[in-house]
Amino acid sequence: MIKLSKGFPIIAKRTVTLGLCTLLVACSALKLLYNQLPTVGYWWLDGYFDVSDQQAPELKRGLREVLAWHKTTELPAIVALLNDVEQHLEKPITGDQMCGWFTRFEPRINAVLDRTAVMAAPILARLTPQQLTYFDKAIAEKNKEWREKWLDPQADDLLDARLERAIENLERVYGSVSREQTQAVKARLAADPFDFERSWQNRLRYQTAFRGWLVAYQGRALATPEAKQAAIQSLQGLWRAAADWRLEDRIQTCQLLADFHGLMTPTQRLNAVKTYQGYQKDLQSLHLEG
């Protein structure tokens, strides 16, 4: 049901994808996805930085350690939040309730960002000039794709793309959505058009800030604890700022999701309860695996 902001920055987006999947976005094969995050994350980062053979072992180990930390430390709080959401799924949900769940989830997002920055900062500080050039080319290509998908199309095409994504996510949680419900969802989306131009500007701003960090710390040894901590805290602040959700957008999204829930039948809401129970079972099992 919820999508990451289209202006969300590189790396920070990847580190919170799991969290959103386990809160209000339906992700298929959750346990498989979760356990494969280090591998998926490595290849995703390699696509931006062309990770060298010398850098690969440290990066892979760091990603595995972040996942192990998340399993033991963060999953219990996420399971508790999912349980709270589940208790309300058979009833109407207000926008304020939805925003309340997001507010409770924010510390979990920040914890993942902070922990990932501890792992990533020393590695990113050792990128070569060639890797920065590779990064620039990758960003340019991704931005071209983004513009073609979200800025260039006509308004009707954008609405259809948003509708397709919304229905896919709704059906993963609630089961099959009727034609009448689909039309109601479309009307609701049309009433709240997404500001793609602002998202584009945010995307460029966060990319510029992140690249500025890469350039500022490129080649630094981070030989002292103080130097390493300064780099980590700087990266944490950058990612937290990028992940911050404008209040107006938050309220709009929360109400939109509450309205979608209001369109669902009792049977569909019961399906959602079962879906969330499955999430909790899977995540609890992952936590016990340690």
Residue ranges and their predicted role:
Residues 35-70:
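Start-of-domain marker
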Residues 73-111:
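Mid-chain, structured segments of secreted extracytoplasmic proteins
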Residues 1-11:
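N-terminal secretory signal peptides that target proteins for export/translocation
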Residues 45, 58-59, 116-127, 135, ...:
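Short, structured motif recognition centered on aromatic/hydrophobic residues
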Residues 121-240:
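Extended amphipathic alpha-helical interaction segments
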Residues 28-31:
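Bacterial signal peptide processing site
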Residues 23-26:
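C-terminal motif of bacterial Sec signal peptides marking the signal peptidase cleavage site
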Residues 42-43, 200, 207-290:
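A cross-kingdom marker for long, charged
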